Amino acid sequence: MDTLTVSHVKKSFGSQEIIRDLSFRVPEHSVFGFIGENGAGKTTTMKMILGLLRMDGGEILVEGEAVCYGQTRTNRYVGYLPDVPEYYGFMTPREYLRLCAEVSGITRKEADKRADELLEMVGLTKADKRIHGFSRGMKQRLGIAQALLGKPKLLICDEPTSALDPLGRKEILDILSAVRESTTVLFSTHILSDVERICDQIALLHHGEIALQGTMDDIHAMHKGVGF
């Protein structure tokens, strides 16, 4: 079963065509890498999946339900980590997750349980200091925990490893690889080694179109000897 289906999607801003007849599928419990240079249309696509931007054509399905601009019905299936997550810096990570859970309608008992589970998963159980003192990598890990609070069917991460050192990137990628047991992951990046490390499938976006798509084994086989 496919958690996400994008079919013939188009998007323009004024006379500039950003997304051109974009189609791809993300199978359940897979890690899907959306790779492309800055400005290729990755973030625009993610915002359309979230219903934050109107499509000019095509259809997007999450768990078989159509995404509609301005409506958040399908977002009950989705957890989202933006490229630069924002926090209340005066809070500890546990306090912050409890607040997010309360806003989402999760009971206090369940919120405490989920916060403990997720902080352990992302390696922040001993991080009792305020969030304003966190490194970029720690903030990204907390962002993943926040995105997973509601047990989403689809986790969307926009450039989660950008501006991180090699160790920080490895920590994030290890987490994303591990969570495929409980959810499906779509993440964007411009770093080829990231998708090679953990992705089941990738789509290379170039000037708003899919230039290359498939499993890593298929792509390596197609481009054997040409340096991919």
Locate the predicted segments by residue:
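Conserved ABC ATPase "signature" region
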Residues: 98, 102, 110-126
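Catalytic Walker B motif of ABC-type/P-loop ATPase nucleotide-binding domains
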Residues: 155-158
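Walker A (P-loop) phosphate-binding loop of ABC-type ATPase nucleotide-binding domains
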Residues: 37-41
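ABC transporter nucleotide-binding domain
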Residues: 171-228
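Conserved ABC transporter NBD signature motif
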Residues: 58-69, 73-74
